[in-house]
Amino acid sequence: YGRLHSGEGARPLTILLAMQNAAVAQIALDHGLRGPQLSVSQACASAAAAIGEAMLALRWGRAERIVVGGSEAPLVAGQLQAWDALRVLAKADKLSPEQSCRPFDRRRSGLVLGEGAAALVLERESTARRRGARIHAELCGYGNAGDASHYARPDPAGQQRAMELTLQDAGLMAGD
């Protein structure tokens, strides 16, 4: 409270710009985007879930076109210390730091944090065909299943359920 009443107040928009939806709102403001706006928070699955939710919004006719994506920027001291406390970070390879990241190697020792972002523009097939767009892919199914297992150790049954829901939504069988 001392700092609060010291006269060093925060900027008026600090809370609004720090909220979970701030990036989504800023992108919409910058580009005049209207329609469904959603900020998805599902750890490593956030961007995949956002794409699935966008596909559903298009399917249900809530929009003709949707910008969807994900980003992560955890490389700040507090985040690194927190991940280190979990004891899941890879041991640094002092001779060849790029070798520290080897996710499919038998000698892997943990994960290496990174930063990144990507965005896609998804649209209804009818909209794309009307404008003569080259169609690169079709999203035909989405499934999302929490497994109520553990924060960092998913239950394979939950992963299987998500795949089953995706196949069911797409009208496909596992062997297709």
Please annotate each region the language model reported.
Residues 1-53, 86-112:
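Conserved catalytic cysteine-centered active-site region
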Residues 1-5, 171-176:
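Short, intrinsically disordered, charge-balanced linker/junction segments flanking boundaries
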Residues 38-42, 63-71, 134-142, 175-176:
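Beta-strand segments within the central parallel beta-sheet cores of soluble alpha/beta enzyme folds
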Residues 48-50, 74-78, 148-149:
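Short, well-ordered, mixed-charge alpha-helical segments that flank or form enzyme active sites
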Residues 32, 59-60, 168-171:
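Residue-level signal for alpha-helix termini/capping positions
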Residues 33, 43-46, 56, 71-74, ...:
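Short acidic/polar capping segments at secondary-structure boundaries
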Residues 96-174:
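Condensing-enzyme catalytic core mediating Claisen C-C bond formation in acyl metabolism
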